[in-house]
Structure formats: structure tokens, C-alpha cells
Amino acid sequence: MMDNMQCGYYNSGSPYNFPSVLGPGAAIGPGPVPLGYCKEPCPTRSLCDPSYIGACGIQPLINPFGPRRAVTTWKINYLVSNRTNQAAHTDPDLINPWGIAIFGNQLWIANGQTDTITNYDLFGNKLLGSITVRNIAQNSSYPTGIAINCTGNFATTNGTLTKSGLFLTCSEHGTVHSYNPQVDPLVSFLVLNEQLTGEIHVFRGLAVAGDVLYLADFFQSKIMVFDSNYNRLLGFPFVDGDTSDPIPISYGPTNIVNIGCYLYVVYARKDPNVPLQAITGAGFGYISIFNLDGTFVRRFTSRGVLNDPWAIIPAPVECGFPPGSLLVSNHGDGRINAFDCNGRYVGPMLNQSGLPVIIDGLRGLAPHYTDFNEIFFTAEVDENIDGLVGSICKDQVIYF
């Protein structure tokens, strides 16, 4: 059984002092999601309960009209690339990486272009051989999101041996794969194939909460929900209820992230010519918050600095971010922006020159749970031709 620190913020209270946000009386609702899902008791309603918009005490990272203040800066370390001389290590299978997870002080990366999961230590040294993620009936699966499974369910099998999957990955070909090295150290087996329905499904992100699997279907513009035996569950609406600022029909969910007792759904704008793909642009993006039963809580943030957003992680308060803040990666402009617990923009992560950190093709983010000073990332470079894994480390403090 994995402990909370290993499972991270996806399946329990966060080690980042990010408060559990389910207030008294705010039941998760009907359906198979257990009321005792949060491993830590949810406290009384806090200012960072997403259903309560209060005075979080927002403090922009840079305020030209305020007093001088200390700001933490960050530096980029390039750990692994598919190209030589681009990073400390080279791995030809690291092409078009998306999701990233940290488990057992190791990095696990889903690579879309090579249909693999690659595994490294925190310095970028490759550990296992590349893990195949492929549907035998197809030439490719194109894995995107990856999630740690802490439940003991969501089985994977090689036909002889069956175990709970350690990781689940989803793909842009509408499939889900489950991996356990005891079943096969180099194969992640197909466990769900929605292409068999005859419809097009493009899964760009996934989340596991209790014994429920949530999939962000970008093409169908919906969240699909399954139980731990991969049976479809209905009755989870996932309808954005912000009538004052409705999400246009040209958008679809590109990722879903479980933080505390809530699900954050990230929306990207579809390419009108190729609706399986997203397009980038300033203000292209929405993020909304839902209960685990799919009922709408509130809009977190809209447009503004969003530019084809994808990953969301808790921001480390130890590095000067307001309590309950979140960091959001932009694939479009390569920035990592901070938002307070009410969804108000705080500012970008900065380099030592006081300028925004920019990572070309930025996609996934994963904080190092035992070290608040480091965040790992994935990036797809040169239009899916190349890939990069790196870390962003706390650098020096500067004053504005």
C-alpha cells in the first residue's frame, strides 16, 4: 500500500500544506465515490475551499506600486532529451512527452510519439528499459496522461498473472493501459478501448479518485467516468455551470486533475480544421472545479494568461506563494503561472533576471514531494519531433 507522500496530492491531502477543501455538509454526493475518500479528515471550511470565494489575501509576485519585496527565482536544469548535447542524458524514446509522475523518487514519463513510458531517477539516469504502451490491433496508441494508482484495484494482466496497476495511462486513440512491473516490467497492458464503440475518443488526461477513473475526452468534449473494473459509470454530469461566462463549444477538456477532494478540469481550444488537436493563443483556456460526483462547484479561472494550459499542481508556500495557490503550465507560451486559491492571477514563475521562466513546448509538471525546491517538467519540442525532461529548482531571492 502506498503512503500519502508517495501518492501525492492526487489521492490524498497534499504534503504542500494545501488544505483539504471539503467543508462540513458538502457531501460528495450519490454514486460510487466513497464519502470517506479523503485519507485525512476534511477540516472546517477554509478560505481555500473552492466553493467559498473569500479574501485570500492575494499578493502579486511583483507589485510596482507596493513596497520592495523578496521574490523567489528559479533555474532550469535539462536532464534528458532525445537529442544529443541538449541535456545531461540522451534517450531516443523520449519524444513528445506529456504526463509525468513521481513515485519512489523516480520519474515516469508518458511519451506520445514512441508509445512508451520511460523511467529515470531524479538526475535523469534511465532505469528500466522503455515500457511499451500499445494496442496490438493498432500501429500506435499515443499515450498522454499518466496517474499513480493507490487503490489496489484497476487490474492489469498478461493473461496469466493479474495485479493492481501501479500506473494508468490514457491515449489519444481512446485507450487506457495499466502497468505493474510484477506482471511485465516492459509492457503496459490495454485495459480499456473506447474505439471499439465505433466513436472517436481522444483522451488527453486522466485522474484516479478512490475507485473511480476520470478521463478527459478532448474530441467528444466530455469527461468519461469508469469504475475500477473499467465499466462505464453514468450520472456524472461534468457540466460547467458558469452562465455569466460560458465556455464556448469550440473548447474541450484537455486534462483533469484531482487535488484534495475536488477535480480541476482544464479546457483548451480545438483546432477548427483538426478538432483532435488544440490550438495555442493568448487567452485560450478555462479551468473549472467539480465535485467528485461531477457536479459543478465554480469556475477557477478563465482566459487571461492561459494559453493552451495543461498541468496543474499545488504551489509550494515555502517558496513565497500564497497558501492554497496553484501552478498552471501553458503549452502555448511555455510559462508557469501562479493563481491564488480563488483563481486570481498572482504572477509567473521568474528566473534570476526577474523575467518569466519560459520552456518551449511545456506540458507536464510534477513537484518533488520530499523537496519543496524542485519541480519536474516535460516538454515537446519542434512540433512533436523532440522531447525534454527537466527540473526547475529554487534559485536565489531577488527584490523588486
From Swiss-Prot:
InterPro entries noted in UniProt: APMV_L690, WD40/YVTN_repeat-like_dom_sf
The entry's keywords: Virion
Gene3D superfamilies tied to this protein: YVTN repeat-like/Quinoprotein amine dehydrogenase
Subcellular location: Virion
Entry GO terms, CC: virion component
Signal sequence extent: none
UniProt xrefs under NCBIfam families: PEPCTERM_chp_1
Family: Belongs to the mimivirus R640 family.
Name the record gives this protein: Uncharacterized protein R648
